Amino acid sequence: MPSSLWKHCLNHLEGELDPQEFNTYIRPLQAIQQGTSLQLYAPNQFVIDWVQNCAESRINALLSHYSSGRIEKALLEVGSCSLQPQPHIQAVELTSKSARSSSRVVDRIPESRLNKNYTFDSFVEGKSNQLPRAASHQVAENPGSAYNPLFIYGGVGLGKTHLMHAVGNYIRSRNPSARVVYLHSEQFVAEMIKALQLNAINEFKTRYRSVDILLIDDIQFFAGKERSQEEFFYTFNTLLEVQHQIILTCDRFPKEVNGLEERLTSRFGWGLTVAVEPPELETRVAILMNKASIENIILSDDVAFFLGRLIYSNIRELEGALRRVIAYSRFTHRPITMELTREALKDLLTLQEKLVTIENIQKTVAEYYKIRVSDLSSKRRSRVVARPRQTAMSLSKELTDHSLTEIGKFFGGRDHTTVLHACRKINELKSIDRRMAEDYHNLLKKLST
């Protein structure tokens, strides 16, 4: 009964929930009956937290309905009801057999191209990347079965590639014989074109359909390239049929990439799609402190927070600014102080001061949500105004040095508790509402260009 009961619940929930939420938090749950309860095993704590906050009461109601009252509630726990050996071991053994049967094919497997510096240990975790990090680690522990494919999307320089390499390095550290291949989508296209020119397309197909783990970066570059999409489509299907892990990254949600065929974007949704958001201030500071320690540099809190507020939407640019400060310190033989930091980044500071003001934030938010700037300072409380107002307050706190009280004055004289509530509300929504997270990310990009 448990499997059919849970299947009924799944079918019902799939019709009620947003597809992204269902695939991310509900589909991965595994069910087994325990007395008058149904034990639901989740891959990680983040899934449990979401289910408890957003779906637990509905699940309990459905369980009671479909079991005629025999099952009273669901119990949530991190784990798996499977007693089978770790899937990653099985997958590697499977491909090892095929490898022994044809050493010529193995010789054609491309090199891994993994960056050894990109590991889970070197990845700085924060609220903005908790779910992608947890999902990636789950895939590394159970490749081919946890989430397949794993699709990670987000802006440039937010850690997508780092997570992808971290999975590959983790798997290789546990099983050196695993055939893990990383490449950029443009490289896939270039190699396919060369194979066509050399009349060696069959060899090309064999190379990428014989790997254990395929990691492809920036799949938006497949857009408009019909032959490349066709080849990748069949490679994708072949690997999934034998439960070999695929991880893909993109700069936006897959269905928003113009020129990608529907048959591809629909398959990307078979596994798990997660977004990497721009890191919050505390995470940016932690990243800076981590990079400074690697360089044996002691970075003061005031300098770290100054840099974290200065650059907020791109980790690569953040690290680049730190490298400039360190280099300037070494060239001038002076310690890293606020004064030196301002000297080293004076051109960037001049540009930022022109761009990021509360007035500019209000104008950008108003244009984005198609409301008047004056609405943000008005007493109107309708949702069409309240949510943009809260968003603008949150952006003002993140991107400027103004206090909560000062920010409130720009929004109709609201007090600091109202601003604080707005910031907390937006942070909460970003973690559970994909549309809110995308809106916030888009606004950050607009304000940083």
Curated annotation (Swiss-Prot):
Residues covered by region (Domain I, interacts with DnaA modulators): 1-71
Gene3D superfamilies cross-referenced by the UniProt entry: 1.10.1750.10, 1.10.8.60, 3.30.300.180, P-loop containing nucleotide triphosphate hydrolases
InterPro entries: AAA+_ATPase, Chromosome_initiator_DnaA, Chromosome_initiator_DnaA-like, Chromosome_initiator_DnaA_CS, DnaA_C, DnaA_dom, DnaA_N_dom, DnaA_N_sf
Region (Domain III, AAA+ region): 113-329
Residue segments, region Domain IV, binds dsDNA: 330-449
PROSITE patterns, sorted: DNAA
One GO cellular component term: plasma membrane
Superkingdom per UniProt: Bacteria
Positions of region (Domain II): 71-112
Designated name of the protein: Chromosomal replication initiator protein DnaA
Gene: dnaA
